[in-house]
Structures are given as C-alpha cells and as structure tokens.
C-alpha cells in the first residue's frame, strides 16, 4: 500500500485555495484545542474576557489612585452593551493599578484615562479599518498610542534630528507605534487621532500636558532637551529590544522591562534599527495546509482523508507580534543558510523573515491505494481587500530555493522556478515528493517497531527526529528596472532581489492534538556598520606545534621538585653518582649535545609535524636484531606527554626493535636520548657502552646470549596516559615514585671527542664491524635462538 502514494502519485504542488475553512471538522477543532489566537480575533468576536487578559501591559503606564469598586455610573441613554463595556473598562483599570510597578514618581497620573468620555470612546465599536484589515485604532494600537504620547513630549513646531533627518512629533509617535506593535500608522493618521481625542479631552490638565507644549518648557530656565525621552544612542545596541521581553502573546511585549524600575520607564527604540518602512514587499498574509486525499475524493484540503497540519487562526493575522531574530534559540545552527546570508550582508537585510512552526499529526497506517499528498503554501504581499500589489506586477523570474536540515546537516536542497503571480499571492512549492517519501518511511518503521514490541521507542525516535528537523526557503525575483539597468551596463550578473525568507520548525503532535501551523515575523539584527557589532567568530584550526617550539617553551616555576637521586641504570648493585635532571646550561653534557663536533643523538628525532605514515621508522642504536619482523618487535612511533600537565616530551617516528635494549633517559632541556640512524650496530660493545653509559655497563655479548641476565621484566619508565598498560621494558632500574629526576653516572670524556666529526665517527664504528656470524647477535645474518624462545620482548599494542 505504501507504494501507491509515492512521489509519482503526488498531487501538484499548488492546490486551489480553501473556500470555506470553517466547514472542515479538523479546522473546527483547532478553534477549541488551540489557546493562542490573534489579538484582533478576540476583539472582533466579542471576547471581552479575552481582552481583559491582554491589558497587563497597561500596568506600568496608568499609575493613579484606586478606583472605587462601585459600578461606574453611565448615561441612561446608553445601550446595555455599552454599559457592560464601560463596567469592563473600569475593571481593567482596577487591575492595572494592582499590577503596575512602583514608578509613579516618574510620571504624573493621567486623569483623562478615567474620564467618562474617554471610557465611552474606548467602548465604542471600531468601524473604520486600515489597509491591513484591522481597526485603525484598535485597543492594541490605542494603548501604544498612549504610551507614545508619554515617550515623545510636545515639541511645538520644532523637529527632532537624527541620522541626518528631521522628525516631527507625530512622525515619532507613528514610528514608536510601529516599533512596539509592528503595525504602521501614518503621520496624518496620528494627527487625526489626536484631534478626535482632543475634541472631548480638551481642558484636562494631564491631557494638555501631553499634547501641548507648556510655557515653562519654552522658557530659558528649563534645560531639559526637547525631543523623545529615554531614546537610546545610536552607538549602543538595543538590549531592551532584543532582550527577550517579547513573548508569545500580543501584549506581553509591552510589559515593564526589569532593568528600568523606579523612575525610568521602558526605553524607546532608535530610528537606527533596520525596521525601516516597507510598503511594496511586506508580507501581509500566509496560508499553509498539508493533507492526504483519497483516490475518489477531490484533492482539496476541506475534503481530505487525513490532515497533517493546517494554519491556525486568520491567515492575515499572525498569532504573535514580530520577534527579534536573536530570540530564536540556536538559529545560526538550526538554519545554516540564513546564517550564511546574514554573514554575507554588507547592510541590513532587505526582505522579511517569517518563522513558521508546524505540528504534524502522523497517520497510524498507510493511506488507501492511489491516495495523493497535497501541500498548499500561499504568501500574500497585499493587505486584505487589495487585488493588486505593485511589487508583484513589477517583478518576474520568481525562484524558490528550499533547504531541509536535520540537526543543522542538510538533507535536501531544491531550486524551482515559479510561475509569474497573477494575483497578490505567490505559491512556492514545498517539496511534496520529499515529504511523501518521509511519511512512507516513518509509517514503515513504526509498524515494524510495533510488531517487535518497541512501539514506545519508535514513537520517541520519530518525535526526536521532527524536533531536529528544520527548513529554510528563500524566495527571489527580478524587477524590470534592475534587468534593464543590468542589460544596459553590459554586466548581467545576479540582479535578483530577495523577497522573503521562510524559516520552518517542526514537531509531532500529541495523541489528542490536531496539526496546526503558526507564523510570525522576525526582526533581523541591526546593521553591524551602525551598531558596531563584529561578525560571529568562527573556529580556526591551528597547525600542530613542532618539536623545536615545544622544547623551547619555558617551564612554569615550581612544576618539578628539586632534583632527587635514584638509579636509572643499575650496574650490578654498584651505586652510581647522581646526575640532576635539569642542570644549569653551562653544566650540560657537551660531549653528547654540543652543536659543533659533538656526537648528537637527536639527529634521528623528527619534528612533531612529521607524521607516522610518511617516514620510515628508525631503530635504536642498541638494536642487535635488525632482521626481525617489524610487526613483532616494533614500538609506538611517537610518545606524547599527557595534556594534563606541562609538555615535556614529543618524539615521533622512533621504532624500537628490541625494547629491552633501549636505554633512554631525560636529559637537559627535556631532550629524549639516545637514538641513532637506521641499521647501526655495535661491534665493540664494551667500548661503546663505556663511552655512552660509563664503565661497568653490561657487555653486549652477555646481553645477546644470556637469558638469565635480564631476569624478570621490571616495569619501565613510561609517561602516563600515553603508553598505557602495555608498556615496554627498559634496562633495569630501581622504581621511584617521582619522574622529575634521574640518576646518571659521571663518565670520563669520550675518546673520540675533538678528533673527528660525527660522520667520521659513525663511519669508523660501522666500518670496524666484521660480518662474523658468530658474533653472538651482532652480525646481520645471525639469528639468536635464545631470543626466539623468550617472551622478554613484546610489541606494544
């Protein structure tokens, strides 16, 4: 059954609009199951109690004496409905006084808000509507208007200059209303509203103070600046605007800002934010539906076999006011394409960002054979009542790019060319083929899990998948003027204009829920050039440090204890003089480490950046068995100190063919010695050992033939957390708890010092070795049976 609604049976991307939304049963459920409705819906449907719930924002504005709890007297000629509204208004004012913060000293009380005429005006039904389809001065806008009067005191005929432009008081009030509500009202509408209110409030002292400049304000004794109060500077970001005081409901964003308690009211927003006026490319409406239609049914959402999700509320009224983009949690990782767009911008974003949150109600079984998946997505660029949008008639070559992500990792990308809109609506596709395949796979996985008894695990997995799912849609178009300019200049280039960016977040519904989709506008961050904010920092991968830079790094003080003596090389019970681990530089072993004419044992130590796969391992100077298989006798090619402490050692590309013969110690400046070039053997073991380790070292012949000379393996000196438990064994030494010092005998000067250079010395040593197979392990063709039978040497895992 699953194959009957695979992508080849998918309905076209664009379905006809739903003519009667209210007739659908699932849509009827959405009005009762959802508790988030738009502000205007609650007003128009007479939900007075719903209006009461949205008036907490008045708390910080209307601070005056409590109103007597008796019902307010009204004119007998008023309609009973108006009387009820007046009583509700009095109740709102009492609630405002009980919830308001204690900053009444910052502003005087406004008695006109309690006046009979003003309350009657507020209770009057709103008949005139604006271009956005809402009442011109709804309760929401009226509250913002009253707040704007307080924030922008009278200036007379003077202007407020900002960013090279002059603003009158009515323009500042209109801009303030737009900032706090997202709804535009013009300067003339503000002026007309002031005249209406002034017709019945004239003479009230508090009203006169807010609408007319007082004589004291014009006198020379007053030094208060003329202009909007509490206006933030252009040189500072907008913490109140992006600080999270906007919430899901329409009016919580007007609640008092916590840092501004006492005598400071909420701060005003600057004209510097990029909420600039948009008239031609503003999105006014949005519609989205996703459903499955049966084979014999019309492929329409209102006759669907199953509805995955549908739009909640009115398509022209989002459920919440505009919210700053920075309030969306982890938006840079959730929507990577938007993050790249914002980083490439040189100025403010020139299009609107819409956040859509869709809850999907999945099916428990496959649909009937021949079913079709339908997706309808409409974006309206014109206010209600308008049949033509100027921006759409001037734009063509519409495109839509869709990016789908899981935990920020892209799952799908598709580019589509859209038909030129014939109305005010644009209908971008939403990858119905991808969704059909996804729903089929999820249904299959769910049924398989139920058969195996893992129903709960499958449900949790699906829910987690949808929580991690996100999508970005970028809609672009080319204006006719831009195309003509581009063609005339001879540089076609990309002259398309970004029209909208849609951000999608998903989740799976609970068992008793219906799938709903909500939308709201997002406010992009201010321009970096204006707000002086740097771009987000990105990670930088640094190259590995070389061995030289690590060794030259100065050691922090008091990291190591004072040098303490203990035997690193045990000489048959003979005590050895102590050699400090970190002697002063002038006491270093010049015979071994001097830069000129010395025998440098560090020539074979490569730098840290030389990787293991790129170099041939170098055997130890004491390697007497070069012919042994590397997989049996090789040692780790690098030893690194633990990251938990100071860096002491970092040696790469060193292979030890016989770890029981590797006598290593830490010398001055943290050098790890000794090591030699590949294939070097020692003929006169006594002389070489005496020259390197002093007299009394065990002869090479005894080491090669005697098993008892090694005795039981003694734990080696290892560096914690780098070698692990499978460490190799050094020459015998007495165990000591400290790794900060080592003992070494004082040996006589090397007989070869000063007589010849390192190369001549090496040639002399190698040239003096005979190819005698009876050399007890020193010859190249000699095989030691004793070594083959013992387990003294094991490869480090």
UniProtKB/Swiss-Prot annotation:
Residue ranges of the annotated DNA-binding region, renumbered to this chain: 130-204
Gene3D superfamilies with a match to the protein in the record: TEA/ATTS domain
Keywords assigned: Activator, Conidiation, Nucleus, Sporulation, Transcription, Transcription regulation
GO biological process annotation, one example: regulation of transcription by RNA polymerase II
Phenotype reported upon loss of the gene: Results in the formation of aberrant conidiophores exhibiting reiterated cylinder-like terminal cells lacking spores and causes delayed autolysis and cell death. Reduces significantly expression of the gliotoxin biosynthetic gene cluster including gliM, gliP, gliT, and gliZ.
Superkingdom of origin: Eukaryota
SMART domains per record: TEA
Locations listed in the record: Nucleus
Molecular functions per Gene Ontology: DNA-binding transcription factor activity, RNA polymerase II-specific; RNA polymerase II cis-regulatory region sequence-specific DNA binding
Segments of skewed composition (Polar residues): 716-726
Inducing stimuli: Highly expressed during conidiation. Expression is positively regulated by hsp90. Expression is decreased by 2',4'-Dihydroxychalcone (2',4'-DHC).
Keyword Transferase: no
InterPro entries referenced in this protein's UniProt entry, alphabetically: TEA/ATTS_dom, TEA/ATTS_sf, TEC1_TEAD_TF
Pfam families reported in the protein's UniProt record: TEA
Disordered as annotated region, ranges: 696-797
GO CC annotation, single: transcription regulator complex
Family: Belongs to the TEC1 family.
Purpose of the protein: BrlA, abaA and wetA are pivotal regulators of conidiophore development and conidium maturation. They act individually and together to regulate their own expression and that of numerous other sporulation-specific genes. Binds to the sequence 5'-CATTCY-3', where Y is a pyrimidine, making both major- and minor-groove contacts. Essential for differentiation and functionality of phialides as conidiogenous cells. Regulates autolysis and cell death.
Protein name, per record: Conidiophore development regulator abaA
Organism listed in the record: Aspergillus fumigatus (strain ATCC MYA-4609 / CBS 101355 / FGSC A1100 / Af293)
């Amino acid at each position: 059954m699953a194959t009957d609604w695979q992508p080849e049976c998918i309905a076209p991307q664009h379905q006809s609009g739903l003519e009667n939304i209210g007739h659908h049963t699932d849509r009827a459920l959405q009005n009762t199951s959802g508790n988030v409705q738009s502000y205007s819906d609650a007003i128009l449907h007479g939900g007075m109690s719903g209006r009461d719930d949205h008036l907490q924002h008045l708390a910080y504005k209307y601070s005056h004496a409590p109103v007597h709890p008796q019902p307010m007297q009204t004119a007998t000629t008023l309609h009973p409905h108006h009387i009820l509204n007046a009583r509700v208004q009095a109740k709102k004012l009492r609630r405002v006084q009980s919830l308001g913060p204690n900053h009444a000293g910052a502003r005087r009380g406004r008695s006109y808000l309690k006046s009979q005429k003003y309350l009657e005006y507020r209770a009057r039904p709103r008949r005139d509507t604006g271009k956005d389809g809402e009442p011109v001065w709804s309760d929401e806008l009226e509250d913002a208007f009253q707040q704007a009067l307080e924030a922008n005191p009278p200036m007379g005929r003077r202007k407020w200059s900002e960013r090279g432009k002059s603003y009158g008081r009515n323009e500042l009030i209109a801009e303030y209303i737009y900032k706090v509500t997202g709804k535009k009202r013009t300067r003339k509408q503000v002026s007309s509203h002031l005249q209406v209110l002034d017709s019945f409030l004239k003479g009230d002292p508090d009203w006169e103070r807010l609408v007319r400049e007082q004589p004291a304000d014009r006198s020379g004794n007053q030094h208060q600046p003329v202009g909007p109060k509490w206006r933030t500077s252009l040189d500072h970001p907008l913490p109140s605007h992006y600080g999270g005081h906007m919430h899901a409901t329409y009016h919580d964003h007007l609640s008092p800002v916590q840092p501004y308690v006492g005598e400071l009211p909420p701060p005003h927003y600057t004209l510097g934010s990029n909420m600039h006026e948009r008239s031609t490319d503003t999105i006014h409406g949005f519609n989205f539906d996703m459903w499955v239609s049966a084979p014999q049914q019309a492929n329409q959402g209102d006759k669907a076999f199953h509805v995955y999700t549908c739009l909640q509320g009115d398509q022209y009224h989002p459920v919440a006011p505009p919210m700053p983009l920075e309030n969306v949690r982890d938006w840079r990782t959730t929507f990577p394409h938007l993050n790249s767009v914002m980083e490439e911008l040189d100025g403010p974003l020139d299009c609107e960002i819409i956040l859509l949150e869709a809850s999907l109600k999945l099916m428990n079984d496959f649909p009937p054979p021949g079913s079709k998946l339908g997706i309808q997505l409409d974006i309206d660029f014109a206010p209600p009542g308008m049949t033509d949008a100027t921006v759409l008639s001037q734009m063509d070559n519409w495109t839509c790019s869709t990016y789908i992500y899981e935990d920020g990792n892209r799952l799908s990308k598709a580019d589509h060319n859209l038909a030129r809109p014939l109305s005010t609506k644009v209908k971008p596709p939403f990858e119905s083929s991808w969704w059909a395949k996804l729903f089929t796979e999820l249904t299959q996985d769910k049924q398989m899990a139920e058969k195996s008894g893992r129903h709960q695990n499958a449900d949790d997995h699906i829910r987690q998948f949808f929580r991690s799912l996100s999508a970005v849609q970028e809609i672009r178009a080319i204006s006719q003027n831009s195309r003509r300019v581009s063609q005339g200049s001879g540089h076609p280039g990309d002259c398309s204009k970004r029209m909208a960016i849609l951000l999608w977040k998903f989740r799976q519904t609970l068992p008793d829920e219906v799938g709903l989709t909500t939308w709201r506008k997002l406010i992009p961050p201010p321009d970096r050039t204006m707000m002086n904010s740097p771009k987000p920092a990105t990670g930088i991968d640094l190259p590995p440090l070389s061995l030289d830079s690590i060794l030259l790094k100065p050691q922090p003080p008091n990291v190591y204890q004072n040098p303490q003596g203990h035997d690193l090389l045990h000489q048959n019970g003979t005590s050895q003089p102590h050699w400090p681990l970190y002697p002063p530089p002038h006491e270093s072993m010049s015979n071994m480490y001097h830069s000129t004419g010395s025998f440098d044992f560090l020539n074979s130590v490569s730098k840290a950046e030389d990787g293991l796969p790129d170099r041939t391992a170098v055997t130890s100077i004491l390697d007497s068995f070069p012919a042994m298989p590397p997989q049996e006798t090789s040692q780790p090619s690098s030893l690194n100190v633990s990251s938990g402490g100071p860096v002491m050692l970092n040696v790469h590309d060193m292979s030890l063919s016989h770890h029981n013969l590797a006598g290593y110690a830490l010398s001055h400046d943290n050098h790890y010695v000794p090591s030699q070039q590949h294939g070097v053997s020692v003929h006169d073991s006594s002389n070489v050992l005496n020259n390197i380790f002093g007299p009394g070292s065990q002869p090479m012949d005894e080491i090669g033939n005697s098993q008892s000379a090694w005795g039981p393996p003694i734990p080696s000196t290892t560096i914690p957390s780098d070698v692990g438990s499978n460490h190799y064994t050094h020459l015998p030494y007495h165990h000591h708890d400290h790794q900060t010092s080592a003992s070494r005998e004082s040996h006589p000067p090397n007989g070869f010092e000063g007589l010849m250079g390192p190369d001549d010395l090496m040639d002399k040593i190698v040239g003096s070795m005979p190819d005698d197979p009876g050399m007890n392990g020193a010859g190249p063709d000699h095989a030691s049976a004793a070594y083959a039978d013992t387990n003294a040497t094991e490869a480090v895992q």
